[in-house]
Amino acid sequence: MSRSLKKGPYVEGRLLARVEKMNAANEKRVLKTWSRSSTIFPQMVGHTIAVHEGRKHIPIYITEDMVGHKLGEFAPTRTYKGHAGSEKSSGLR
C-alpha cells in the first residue's frame, strides 16, 4: 500500500539537507544513513549513500532508475545460507 498523495513522499529532512548541501558545493562523498524508509529523490542521483542493514552500512550508488523507491529496498537485511543438507545428499557415506 502506497503513501497518501496529499502527504507526499517521505524523506528524512537531515538526509535531504545534506544531499542538497553537497550538490551546492559540487562534492561527492559517501553519506551514512539509518533512514531505510526515505524515498529516493532526483537530487540524490549520482551520490553514494551508505544504508544501514542492521550490522553495517551498505554503500549504494543512486541512479535515475532508483528514483521513487525506498533506500531500504537496496540493502537487504536477511542473509539466506541455504537449508542444511541431509547425509544422503552430501555424498559422504
UniProtKB/Swiss-Prot annotation:
HAMAP family xrefs: Ribosomal_uS19
This protein's name: Small ribosomal subunit protein uS19
Its job: Protein S19 forms a complex with S13 that binds strongly to the 16S ribosomal RNA.
Matching NCBIfam families: rpsS_bact (TIGR01050)
Similarity comment text for this entry: Belongs to the universal ribosomal protein uS19 family.
Keywords from the named record: Ribonucleoprotein, Ribosomal protein, RNA-binding, rRNA-binding
GO annotation terms (biological process): ribosomal small subunit assembly; translation
Taxonomy of the source species: Bacteria, Bacillati, Bacillota, Clostridia, Eubacteriales
Cited InterPro entries: Ribosomal_uS19, Ribosomal_uS19_bac-type, Ribosomal_uS19_SF
Organism of derivation: Desulfitobacterium hafniense (strain Y51)
Single GO molecular function: structural constituent of ribosome
A Pfam family assignment: Ribosomal_S19
CC terms in the record's Gene Ontology section: cytoplasm; small ribosomal subunit
